C-alpha cells in the first residue's frame, strides 16, 4: 500500500483505531472520558473527510475506494455519531449504565457505515454492512436494566441474520452470473447474466429492504425502536438508515435503468408509504409511532430511487435531512427521559411549557417530519415528489403526496400534547444537560438552515453522483 492510498484511508482508520482505543482505555482507566474521546474522533473524521486533499483510490485498494461520494457520507456518519454520543453520555448515567463499551461500539458502527459507503466490491460491502449491524446488536440490547432492551436486541439479531442471508445469497448469485465481485463490473455484466443475475439482484434488494425498513420487511422496526435505548435509536434511525440509502445509491445509480427491478421497488415504495402511515396513525406509543413513520419516510426514499437522475440527488439530500430530523426527535425524547422512558404520546402533555427547550426541538422535529415549511422536511419531500413527477412516476407520486398529508395528523398530535394539553402532575421531564443541549441545538439548527438554504447541499448531492 502506497502513502497516497494510506492517506485516503485515514478517515476509516481514525474510526477503527478510535473504537479500539476507547474500549481499551475504559478497561485500564474506568470513567466517562470515552464520550469525549469519541466525539473528538468523530470530529477528526469529519474534518479530515472535508478538508484533506482528494486522493482517490483507483484501482480500489482492499476493496475500498475513496471518492466524493464516500467523503460526503463519511462526514454525515461522523456528525450523526458525534451528536449521538453527546446524547448518550448523560442518558446512560441516568439509566445506570456504565462502561466505555457504549461509545466504543458507536464508533465501531460508524466505521462499518464508512466501509459501506466506500465499498468497491461486494465482499467489502457485506463486511461493512455486517460490522455496523453487529454494533447495533450490542447497542440495542445494552440497557441491561430493562428486559425490553434485551428482547429488542434478540429480535434485531434474528432479523439481521435473515437479512444477512438474503444479501449473502444475492452476492453469491451475482458472482456466479458475472464472474466478479467488483460492483461496477457486476453491474456492467448483469445484462448477460440472465435469470441468475436477476435473482441475485432481487435477493440483494430484499436484504436491503430489511436494513432500511421497507414494508413488508419492516415488522422488526417498532419493537426495536420501543425497546432500545433512545440515543441508540436516534443513531440507528439516522446513521444506519443513511448507510442503507448510500448502499442503494452505490448499487442502483450505476445501473442507469432499473429494468425488471422497477416492479419490486415500486411495490416496496407503495407498501411502505401506505402501511407505514396507516400504522402510525393508530399508535399511542410515541416511539412505535416514529418507527412506523420511518417506514413511510423510507418509502419516500424508495420513490426517489425509482425516479433516477434527480431522484438519486433527492435521496442523498433526504438522507441528511432525515438524519437531522430523527436526531432532533429522539434526542429530545432521550433528554426528557429520567429513570423510566417516555412511552405514550400522552406522556408529553404540557412538557412544552415545563421543558421549553426540549419541547421546541421536539416540535420542530415533528413539523419537519410532517413536511411543513420552512423546514428541511418540506424541501426534501418536495424534491422527491418533483423528481418522481419528472421521472414518470406520477401515480406513485400522488400516493406519496396524499400519505404525506395524512401523516401530518400523527406528527401534529405530538405538538398538540406538548402545548395544548395540561401537564401530567406525576412528572415534568428532565432538564437538558450541556451535552444534550448542544446536540439538540445543532440538529434543530440544521433542520432550519437546510430548509431555508438547501442549495449548497443539493449541489453537493448532484456533484457526488456524477
From Swiss-Prot:
Main location, first listed in the record: membrane
Reactions the enzyme catalyzes: a quinone + NADH + 5 H(+)(in) = a quinol + NAD(+) + 4 H(+)(out)
Gene: nuoN
InterPro entries the record matches: NADH-Q_OxRdtase_suN/2, ND/Mrp_TM
A GO biological-process term: ATP synthesis coupled electron transport
Keyword terms of this UniProt record: Cell inner membrane, Cell membrane, Membrane, NAD, Quinone, Translocase, Transmembrane, Transmembrane helix, Transport, Ubiquinone
Known EC number: 7.1.1.-
Family: Belongs to the complex I subunit 2 family.
Species assigned in the record: Geobacter metallireducens (strain ATCC 53774 / DSM 7210 / GS-15)
Name this polypeptide is given: NADH-quinone oxidoreductase subunit N
Compartment(s): Cell inner membrane
One Pfam match: Proton_antipo_M
GO cellular component, one term: plasma membrane
Membrane topology annotation: Multi-pass membrane protein
Function (record text): NDH-1 shuttles electrons from NADH, via FMN and iron-sulfur (Fe-S) centers, to quinones in the respiratory chain. The immediate electron acceptor for the enzyme in this species is believed to be ubiquinone. Couples the redox reaction to proton translocation (for every two electrons transferred, four hydrogen ions are translocated across the cytoplasmic membrane), and thus conserves the redox energy in a proton gradient.
Superkingdom of origin: Bacteria
One GO molecular-function entry: quinone binding
